[in-house]
Amino acid sequence: MAQKTTISVIKADIGSLAGHHTVHPDCMAAASRVLAEAKKNGVINDFYVTHVGDDLILIMTHTKGVDHPDVHGLAWEAFKKAAEVAKELGLYAAGQDLLSDAFSGNVRGLGPAAAEMEIEERPSEPIVIFAADKTEPGAFNLPLYKIFADPFNTAGLVIDPRLHDGFVFEVVDVFEDKGVHLNTPEELYDLLALIGTPSRYVIRRVFRKDGKIAAVVSVERLNLIAGKYVGKDDPVMIVRAQSGFPAVGEVLEPFTFPHLVAGWMRGSHNGPLMPVPVRDARPTRFDGPPRVIALGFQVKNAKLVGPSDLFDDPAFDEARRTANKVADYIRRHGPFMPHRLDPSEMEYTTLPQVLERLKDRFKPVKDLPVPKVKHSEMLSGAEEAHD
């Protein structure tokens, strides 16, 4: 049996230059040095370091399988070194996603987000790695549905015999830590009934009907781990493409629609997901709008060839213009829904504190008195004074 290759994409917010919008080059260099030493020592086969917004992203290939403590420990060490540099430079929110001081064999539950898949390499193994900033794991629900279940997006579902049987979606309830497998197209409506609530039901993995993995998403929610708001979850995703999977163009097509996602400023607002090249993955306006990058690689003998910055293409200019128009429109709502998230998503903001402070002032509607407000005497002196 051929040796399997593991692709691990692990990200963390370790501190940003001037607010929450980018990773300092020295932090990326610190992480790269850690990974280069690990590659030299045979812990990993290859790596690439990048960022989206203020999230440092480690892309690694190896042959150790998913959730391997050596690989996760390596990522943890790289993040710690980068965070040390961030603290030396006085960067904002240095080490924000590192919720523990001690590594326990796996980064899951400690703050960083991880998407990993173990595969038998095809003769040509193209993959696309997505990373988003200022949003949550459920932001990939709509694109994944379109990639793997919508024939209006993916022509291969109709005309490619290898895709025609459909795919299996693994959906996770992130509140209850439970999951379910749903077959498409047979259970398409059941799938949509769940994933239309992306704050709770998140697509974690997609499989072909023969069991081969097609896509994987990080599903960690930092507020559920930390018990308070510590930043949005900023997911990463790996998607296999071509030769039995959707074509690269079909994988990218959903991002021509900058759909609304939760996150943006203080993780408490809906906004359009803007597809951008890495050089523009620096959200500034109202700490946004939310951004997503896409890097294309070939994987050969557990080594990375690439990347190609796939959203660095004028074909996505219109999506970016639309995202800016939507951002203009929805920002006009200020603190009102639907721009601001609903109360269930405001649990880790000031809303619970406000409600606690006002709880004794809430009364049954029928018992609410008419308020008496003292007015200043009008300058004209013509109006009557009020109590």
From Swiss-Prot:
Where is Mg(2+) 1 bound in this sequence? 13, 20, 54, 96
Query: Which pathway does UniProt place it in?
Result: Carbohydrate biosynthesis; gluconeogenesis
Task: Quote the function comment for this protein.
Answer: Catalyzes two subsequent steps in gluconeogenesis: the aldol condensation of dihydroxyacetone phosphate (DHAP) and glyceraldehyde-3-phosphate (GA3P) to fructose-1,6-bisphosphate (FBP), and the dephosphorylation of FBP to fructose-6-phosphate (F6P).
Q: What is this protein called?
A: Fructose-1,6-bisphosphate aldolase/phosphatase
Q: Which InterPro entries match?
A: FBPase_V (IPR002803), FBPase_V_sf (IPR036076)
Description of its domains: Consists of a single catalytic domain, but remodels its active-site architecture via a large structural change to exhibit dual activities.
Instruction: Report keywords, A-Z.
Output: Carbohydrate metabolism, Gluconeogenesis, Hydrolase, Lyase, Magnesium, Metal-binding, Schiff base
Where along this sequence does the record place binding of Mg(2+) 2? Answer: 54-55, 133, 234
